[in-house]
Amino acid sequence: MNKPNVLLFDIDNTLLDFSAGAMQAMEEIFRAAGLPYAPEMFAVFQVENDKLWARIERGELTIAGLRDVRWQTILARLGLEADGAAMEDAFRDRLHESAVPVAGAPEVLARLHGKYRLCAASNGPYAQQVNRLRRAGMLDAFERLFISGQMGAEKPSRVFFDRCLAQLPGVRPEQCLMIGDSLTADIAGGRAVGMRTCWFDPADRGAAMPPQADWQIGRAHV
């Protein structure tokens, strides 16, 4: 089998450190709302946010639906009262400006640029993801951006990946390598349409390579 020549990168926690940006945004919106904040509260955000994204990946929830319930759910878990919709808006405004690269990611893109066709494939609002890539100095590395907010479908749906391929005329699925940290959205989603896959383990847990991935890398190998 020939080596893939089109690389599709997930964005959050693959190229950009979503967790770092979200933690900073959470602290800022709590301070602005006059709510108590402690770093350990971020663990509640992570658990509840991951649950909601898992529902999106299973097709049970839309990104718009996530916005409606995310902060309402998190505040309830923390025993705090505030306007969940206003907190969501404030959180997204701050996240829009967040551009903390995953360690080594800019250098990897620089090495690959010109040798492969690089694309981004991400769930999220289009303007937000474009702005974050621009602020991180990564935007110009990409030939195409496949962002769910503009694609009208989310990973891991076949519709999302089929629409990616439709915008790459003449490219067969097996010529594409989907790289990302989500075994569901990135690895299972890419594999389902015939793409080859590379699981990025951002925590460097040293876990065994999942059977649905063709390759595995961690931060130490970026």
PLM features per residue range, with description:
Residues 2-103:
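N-terminal helical cap/lid subdomain that shapes the substrate entry/recognition surface
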Residues 103-104, 159:
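Short, conserved clusters of charged catalytic residues that mark active-site
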Residues 115-116, 194:
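Glycine-centered short loops/turns at secondary-structure junctions
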Residues 104-115:
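Catalytic-core regions built around general acid/base machinery
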